[in-house]
Every structure is written in structure tokens, then in C-alpha cells.
């Protein structure tokens, strides 16, 4: 059959086991059917080090140009990785770099298959976590003191006016932390969430702790409410969907009692924690989609999990691993589907959706990677290696094309 043509997307390669899987997916599930048109950036740690991390910035700028990108999982180096890879320095997370440049919101949604039941038995539909991927504790300045003394927060405006507040009079050693966010980033977060809710026709919840954080968290609450009332309420009413704000502790209680089927918007740290909680309760981080959406309509798709280091070391010793490729496949299908939507290329979008269906059908037939076998409640399960599993998905895909 003739290969499907497509518009250009940004391709960002990664590290370790996911880099190996990335190539398998392209070779077996994509290249035989689609004339892949990608602008390639190697975000593997060695090349990031070689370019002084300029490649991460270049990739983000390319996403702004082409509007769609797909990213492999990457290493965020710690001290041990600096030594292992003989790095020039401890480079920042490429995800953080890309998020800061795109000013985006990360939406993570579990991939549901019959036969894997959520730990929370009331959940029937996916719960999407919208995480504000900017600022707060991730951009905090921290200080450790071993002496008594006064800690102050000082803001000096451009005109030289100074505001000063005492944080605490320390009678002994202690720790300090100062964090920030910007109105413009919170506004972008709100717009991304409201637009995503409209696109997916789902209710939107937003939670923080404004009863305790009466300036910081309340600013988030007020900006969300103001933007909703002025720009989105009418469209929400038309679609019959709802936006509401609640405290984070109340939100947790509501989530556990709910049936699912909504978007839960969270501040940066809350979203980091709750996305792992939701993914684990639904099954696995390897069964989770992740897309970074910017308010001006740029999309970056990736797997929600890491580089699967333990499997990579075993792979280097010649062992065939059973690493789950589903989230990485869905990163590709998400990007191809979005490219198809933006370009009016129905053939490309249809292919992406058929590949997703082939993945689900393969698992529901009892063929899966080892990590899913322990969660499986369906027919008898067969644990396959990554390569075997991808080839089974290919067989299912061939039936659907």
C-alpha cells in the first residue's frame, strides 16, 4: 500500500531503554505505513552535553514553528549521572526547558483497557490531570542556615520602591524557601485548561489551598474565575460542561468518590504528585498519555514515564526485556493525530487512531508486557518481550488497515 503523507512534526529522541523502543516503534509500526516527515533533535544526554543543552532550546523553538512535537523520555542528570556520563555539568531537565519556552500545561490521561480494573473501584472513566508546569517549588530559591537570625522577604520594584516582610526570627538553625509564579503564566495555564475542556467536552475542576495561602493560591483562584467568567462561561454552558473551584483536600475526597471523566487542574507540585497517584491507581505510568499544550496552540506529546534504566542495563548485557512501549506509542499517535487534525489530513488521523486500537486489542486478547500481567483480570495473560509485543501490535494493526 502507498504510504500516508504528512506535514512536518518535531521529533525529539531520548535516552536508555526508551531510545531503543523509540526506534523499534518507528521501524515496525510507523515507517512501513507513514512517510514520516520529522525535524529531528537528539535530546539524548551525550548530545545535550556536547551542545551545552542548546539542542533542548532548539527543539522547543522548532515546536513553536511546526506546532506539533513528539518526545522520547530523557534523563534528568543527578550527581551519579554526571559521573556516569562524564558530563560538563548537571544539566537541567529538558522537559523543564521545553515547558518554560512553550509556557505550556501538561495534561496526563490514563489509557484504559478492559481487564485492568482501577484500584479505586468507583472509577469508570479516565481522570485527566492538568499540571501547571511552571514555577512554584520547581523554581524556588532555598537557604539553609545554622545560626539564629531574622529571615526577610524583600521585593524591589523597577522604580526602586521596596517592600519588606519578616518571614521568621530564627532562634536556632533552620531552612528557608522562596518561590514565585507570574500572572502571565497563571493566565496561560487557565486558558490551556479551559480550551482543553472545550476540545474534549469534559468538566474542569481546579483546586488549591487559598484558605491557608491567602495571596499565592488565591491569585490562582481569582485569575481562573475571572478568565472563565469573561471568556469561557458561555461556551461551557453551550456544551453542558462545568467549571468549579474547590480546596485541594476536598478535591481529593471528591476524586476518590467520583466515576471519573473530567479534568483536574492542579498547581505544579500538586499536579506532579496527583498525576502519579491517578496513573498508579488506574494501572501504570506506562499506560498514561502526556501532552504539553500551550495557550497559543502548540502541542508536545511524550510518555509520562522515565527512561527505564534497569531494563536498559539488562538490555546492554544481551537480555531481551519486557518493557511496556504503550505510552511511547501513544505519544507518536497523539502527535500524528494532532498533525492530521491541524492539516485536515483525515488519513493520517485515522491511521493514528487505528494504531491505538491495535494496542488496546492486543492487550485485551491477553498479550502484554510483564508489568501488566500482575494487574490483569481478564483471560489468560501471556507475558511478551518488548519486541514480541510490538510485533503482535503490528499484526493487529494490519487487520485494521
Question: Residue ranges of each PLM-predicted region?
Answer:
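A structured beta-alpha segment of the ubiquitous adenosine-cofactor-binding alpha/beta core
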Residues: 48-61, 228, 232-261
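Glycine-rich phosphate/pyrophosphate-binding loop and the adjoining helix
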Residues: 133-134, 139-190, 197, 345, ...
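Glycine-rich phosphate/nucleotide-binding loop
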Residues: 255-354, 361-365
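Glycine-rich phosphate/diphosphate-binding loop of Rossmann-like nucleotide-binding domains
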Residues: 4-24, 28, 153-246
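Flexible, glycine/charged-enriched surface loops at secondary-structure junctions
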Residues: 35-40, 200-208, 232-245, 340-352, ...
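N-terminal glycine-rich phosphate/adenylate-binding segment common to multiple enzyme folds
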Residues: 48-162, 269-273
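N-terminal beta-loop-helix "entrance" segment that forms/cooperates
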Residues: 33-57
